[in-house]
């Protein structure tokens, strides 16, 4: 099983083994713990539930308290279920700590987070419209307006999913194929190359790269 919940600390830069300066995102995964398991006999699939971050009991509702007490697991603020094989699930017990050394230096990972909220935004910021600097295209006085949004009598309506001004941000985004630059087990930190979605102190999920695994499978199939 490979998967961690972490908190985005922020961005910095480090020197790699070749002496090049690399921008990295620092993710704190120090308090991950196994709080539940799914078995094929009971749930028809196999998975391990990871908890992250401490929380007081009085903040939890009755259902959440019952889940932790039934599993005899510590209270955790954030939960995430990771699919595993039955053999992998058997190697984990409720209460086990999951540390940063689950991922190795140089490994490719996918990091999922919630993007920063930007409120009500126009089409140039939200959809990267070029704007009308020379021609109007229906923008009237302002060149940052979206312009015409439809036709005349036919079809006589605005098509669904038309790109228009509106709320921008607070979307779940997965950044794929990020390289693990370094792992600090003592401090519970994972450093990944590049930026990940979300604001500082936001919760992120780290998984092995899906595309890297698919490429390895295709390469093995071609070699066979």
Curated annotation (Swiss-Prot):
Gene3D superfamilies: 3.30.160.810, Translation factors. GO terms for biological process: translation. It holds the Pfam family Ribosomal_L3. Keywords: Ribonucleoprotein, Ribosomal protein, RNA-binding, rRNA-binding. Residues 132-153 are annotated as: Disordered. The keyword Ribosomal protein applies. GO terms for cellular component: cytosolic large ribosomal subunit. Disulfide bonds: none annotated. One of its GO terms (molecular function) is rRNA binding. It comes from the Bacteria. The keyword rRNA-binding applies. One of the primary rRNA binding proteins, it binds directly near the 3'-end of the 23S rRNA, where it nucleates assembly of the 50S subunit. Belongs to the universal ribosomal protein uL3 family. Part of the 50S ribosomal subunit. Forms a cluster with proteins L14 and L19. This is Large ribosomal subunit protein uL3.
